[in-house]
Amino acid sequence: LIEAYEKGKESRIRNCYGVKKADDNLQQEIDATVKYFQAHNPQSIEISQCDSIYKDGNYTYMYITYNLVLDNNQSYPCISTYMVQKKDNNKYYVLSTSEITDDMSKQAATKYALFMKTDAYKQYATDYDKFIKKNPGYEEKIASKLK
């Protein structure tokens, strides 16, 4: 999914969500995320870790840590989380924001707070802080591209 977003490959993105055509909400989500990746203009992506934060029945809350390798060869640390659901075909698909219930959201927030105490999250936070200190104004530059 991360690589599909970076390349702007909408058919591959929709496949990760298990849909052939995105509804308006999902399409907005896809468009915003593709635009976010385009704003960074990465040369490549390096996936660091991908694992579950928690599992509940057919639902799993996943995290992915990765670096966007920029044109100056610096690595911009990122973390993304996704709620996935195991469907009847035994494949997991990402849930769109509109498919996530309030209860799922609350549980995810609680579990994410615990996840923030793990080594994986601490490493991401350390790497991110180092990048921002070396590149003051980077976030503002990206934010201005997203307006």
Where does each model-flagged region fall?
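Short, aromatic-enriched amphipathic alpha-helices that serve as compact interaction elements
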Residues: 1-12, 124-134
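Hydrophobic/aromatic beta-strand elements that line small-molecule binding cavities or substrate pockets
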Residues: 47-53, 79-86
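Low-complexity, intrinsically disordered terminal/linker segments enriched in charged
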Residues: 94-147
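"Short basic amphipathic alpha-helical interaction patches in structured regions
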Residues: 76-81, 97-99
